[in-house]
Amino acid sequence: MREKDYVVIIGSANIDVAGYSHESLNYADSNPGKIKFTPGGVGRNIAQNLALLGNKAWLLSAVGSDFYGQSLLTQTNQSGVYVDKCLIVPGENTSSYLSLLDNTGEMLVAINDMNISNAITAEYLAQHGEFIQRAKVIVADCNISEEALAWILDNAANVPVFVDPVSAWKCVKVRDRLNQIHTLKPNRLEAETLSGIALSGREDVAKVAAWFHQHGLNRLVLSMGGDGVYYSDISGESGWSAPIKTNVINVTGAGDAMMAGLASCWVDGMPFAESVRFAQGCSSMALSCEYTNNPDLSIANVISLVENAECLN
C-alpha cells in the first residue's frame, strides 16, 4: 500500500446494547444480568477491520449529539479509524440496536433505532466529494439510503466501489446500478433476491454469476455457506474457494471482516483468487472471536491462518 492511499467507507455506525439474563426471564419484572455496550454498524465495522489490516480508513457516517454518539466516535477513532468527516446531527439519537437474550444465549427480542442513517444524504456526501474521489477504493453498505448510494455510484469517478448488500431487503437499492459497482459481496439469499434466480446448490451458481455480469457487475464474491465462496469477474475468471474450518464463537461481524479483506487486498494489488482466500481468513478470525471485530486481525495473522487452515471440503 502506498503511503498516500486511503479507503473511504460510507455506511452505518451504531451502538449495540445487549442484555444477558443470568436466569430464565421473568417478564414485567427486573431481571439480574449483564449489559454490554459495543460499537457496531456495518460500515463502521468494515472501517475498523480495514484499519486493523494497516489501511488508512476514513469513515463517513452519522451520529447523534448524544452520549452514544461521542462514545462511538471516540472508540472508533481509538481503533485507528479517521472519523473527522462523520456528521454529528443535533437533537438526533445515535443509531442503536437493543437486544435481550435469555440465559441460554437465545435472543428473545430486539429493537433497532437507525433513522439517523437518513442523514447520510447526497448533500452531505457532496461536501466531501473531492476527498471521496481521491480514495483508492470506496466501500458502501446498503444501510444508507438509495439516494446516497446513487450519489456514490454516480460520483465515484474512476474509484472502484465495493458494496455490501447487508440484507435481502436492503440490497434491492442497487439492483439497477450493478454496472456501476466494482465488487459485490452477497450471500445466497441476497443473490437470489437481486437476480431472481433460485440458488439451490453449486450447480446454479454459474447461471447466477452470468446474470450479474450481464448486468454490468465487475466482480462477484458470493458466500455460499458450507459450500464456500464462489468468485467470478466480468472477464471470465471464476472459481470456488473452500470454507475454512473455524471454531465459531460469534457470527456477528464475519461478513464485515470479509468485505474489509477484499477492499484491503484491492489496495495492495493482490490477485482476485488470493484476495478471496485472504478475505475468508479475515471472516474466520471474526467468527472465532467473542468480539464483533477481532483485535488480533492483521495481515500477518490472516496469512498464517490461511496457510495453515484446514478446509471443510
Curated annotation (Swiss-Prot):
State the name under which the record lists this protein.
Answer: Pseudouridine kinase
Membrane-spanning parts: none
Q: One Pfam family, please name it.
A: PfkB
* Catalytic reaction(s) noted: pseudouridine + ATP = psi-UMP + ADP + H(+)
**What species is given as this protein's source?**
Escherichia coli (strain K12)
The similarity comment for this entry is: Belongs to the carbohydrate kinase PfkB family.
Q: What is the lineage of its organism?
A: Bacteria, Pseudomonadati, Pseudomonadota, Gammaproteobacteria, Enterobacterales
Q: Which UniProt keywords apply?
A: ATP-binding, Kinase, Nucleotide-binding, Transferase
Recorded coiled-coil stretches: none
Q: What does this protein do?
A: Catalyzes the phosphorylation of pseudouridine to pseudouridine 5'-phosphate (PsiMP).
GO terms (molecular function) for this protein are: ATP binding; pseudouridine kinase activity
